[in-house]
Amino acid sequence: MLRQIIDSFDSAILAFLTHGALHTATYGHAVSHVADFYLFKGVLPLAMLCAIWFDTRERRQWQWQRQMVVATVLSGVLALFIGRVLAHYLPFRQRPLYDSSLHLTFPIAATPEAVLRTWSSFPSDHAMLWSAVAMGIFLVSRWMGVIALLQCAFLICLPRVYLGLHYPSDVLAGIILGAGVTCVVTRKPIMERFAPVIVRFIDRYPNVSYAGLFVILFELATTFDEPRELAQSIFRHVLHG
């Protein structure tokens, strides 16, 4: 019964997007670029985290804000990892782009076809990652958090549904799971176990710390695409010789 409700919901949303006035070649081309550009995915929310980190207007809350930034970054990494583990071990769900039973036509996505065909659609790891980051921002700054959540919804999640990369339920589940990860990691008893130590280390060794943080934020913004591709290349070379 639940599966039928979800399928009906997904089909209705996809039909609306693909048969509506927005389904044009020009709009599809623009959305494809928005979905593929890292600027619209990770750079904006991570820039907000940097702004929070260096915001010294409230000195009494400064250390807490920096601890929250650390916890948010960790939440994002953890959410991305959990999302890809779930996609690997849960029953495979074909992406709507390749489901001929839907009888829908989607714009061509920029992501390589081989990657799309072999990765399960559920849950959306992009939705998990960036909803986790957006929730962390929201817990520190309401107005910045609202912007981050809207950016996650309209510049990350909605384009991926429009392009047929995910079903609406994929991104909704990803948003809920990602935000949930942040809510757990940022709980005071949990955050106090690791965040203050990391902040003190950064304060004590700023040069090496900020260099390392730059690399971490870069990889997070690009969803660790290059390390993943390198690992897959090495694995294929070792496996096939």
What are these regions (language model features)?
Residues 43-52, 127-143, 176-188:
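Membrane-interfacial alpha-helical segments at the cytosolic side of multi-pass membrane proteins
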Residues 89-98, 155-181, 229-236:
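Interfacial helix-loop-helix junctions of multi-pass membrane proteins
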Residues 2, 65, 69, 73, ...:
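Multi-pass membrane proteins that catalyze or facilitate reactions on polyprenyl-/lipid-phosphate substrates
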Residues 1-46, 83-113, 225-241:
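N-terminal transmembrane-helix/juxtamembrane module of multi-pass inner/ER membrane proteins
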Residues 76-81, 153-164, 218-223:
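Aromatic-anchored segments of alpha-helical transmembrane domains
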Residues 34, 126, 170:
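Divalent metal-coordination and catalytic microenvironments
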Residues 63-139, 143-151, 228-235:
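Membrane-interface loops
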Residues 76-88, 175, 179-186, 222:
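Transmembrane alpha-helical segments of multi-pass membrane transport proteins and ion-pumping complexes
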